[in-house]
A protein has these predicted regions:
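Topology signature of small-to-medium multi-pass alpha-helical membrane proteins
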Residues: 1-137
């Protein structure tokens, strides 16, 4: 990490954290259901279609976090993969939540509050990762 700017220490940590939280989310979703906003079939059908895509997100976030942390040449390239996965997830989730009126549940629903956090986190981290990786790569 010899010539990396200070934000390169934070970004890898956030990407690795994102990978770990993504795995924890799916464990909760399938085992306890605590993160489910509603139990209706239309909702679970949509959410249940994401584990493979989110696994890709977790893998690319973890790998890019390691690569950026170590200052490797491939770290920024992996960062572009992670950024695209984060932005795609944000776009899909935000569109679904708007079209189904789920943001109206935010004041009284902890799962929806967490969903909102995921939406903001994915969009913001996706943009930051894209910009940093593009400049670095």
């Amino acid at each position: 990490m010899s010539q990396n700017p200070a934000h390169f220490s934070l970004l890898p940590a956030l990407l690795i954290l994102t990978a770990l939280v993504t795995v924890a989310y799916w464990v909760s979703y399938f085992i306890g259901g605590d993160v489910r906003v509603v139990d209706a079939r239309w909702y679970t059908a949509f959410e249940s279609s994401f584990p493979i895509a989110d696994a890709w997100l977790a893998v690319t976030a973890f790998i890019s976090g390691i690569g950026l942390w170590r200052g490797t040449a491939w770290g920024p390239r992996a960062g572009l993969l992670a950024a695209s996965a984060l932005l795609y997830l944000a776009g899909m989730d935000i569109t679904f939540d708007i079209e189904n009126g789920l943001y109206a549940l935010v004041p009284n629903s902890q799962p929806m509050q967490f969903e909102l956090l995921i939406n903001v986190w994915s969009a913001a981290l996706g943009i930051v990762t894209l910009v940093v990786s593009w400049k670095r790569g």
